[in-house]
A protein has these predicted regions:
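Glycine/proline-enriched, intrinsically flexible loops and inter-domain linkers
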Residues: 1-148
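A short, hydrophobic C-terminal helix/tail in secreted or cell-surface proteins
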Residues: 149-153
Length: 153
């Protein structure tokens, strides 16, 4: 596999390679392992059966994290997702959908509620952070939105 020095590797890249990863795509400027079984050995169908019937390893370090924190965090999150955020207990995660004003799906992240006034979206490669900043500003929510590959920096 050809590896570029201009694309980052996740902290788990070496584990993916040890597990037999033979192909990857670039996702959020990070290598994302995409294939463990070569086509001549059954390829995608073998991997599909493993997902369906066994346990598989997924390196999701390529996903972005967006923190929503502040006194209006719950109201803000409840406004932007299709699920009732008030029913998510602290330290529980849920699969959620974010839609635009016409009902089109913008993203389908995992949402983790840390505390009463703090949530974390774990999302794929979209500009949802910009969308959330716009909603926060236009509707005058009192929230801080923070996104970074290393949120504690």
């Amino acid at each position: 596999m050809l590896i570029s020095t201009r694309v980052r590797k996740s902290p788990y890249w070496h584990l993916s390679m040890e597990a037999g990863c033979w192909r990857a795509t670039v996702y959020n400027r990070i290598y994302h392992p995409r294939g463990y079984v070569k086509p001549e050995d059954g390829g995608a169908m073998v991997e599909y059966e493993a997902i369906k019937n066994h346990v598989t390893m997924w390196n999701v370090a390529v996903e972005r994290q967006i923190q929503v924190k502040g006194p209006d965090a719950e109201a803000f999150v409840d406004y932007v997702i299709t699920r009732d955020a008030t029913k998510i207990s602290p330290m529980r995660a849920r699969y959620v959908i974010l839609c635009n004003q016409y009902g089109g799906v913008l993203n389908d992240p995992i949402l983790l509620r840390i505390s009463q006034d703090e949530f974390w979206f774990s999302l794929s490669d979209s500009d949802i952070g910009l969308y959330l900043q716009g909603v926060n500003h236009d509707n005058r929510f009192n929230c801080l939105l923070y996104t970074s590959p290393s949120p504690r920096d």
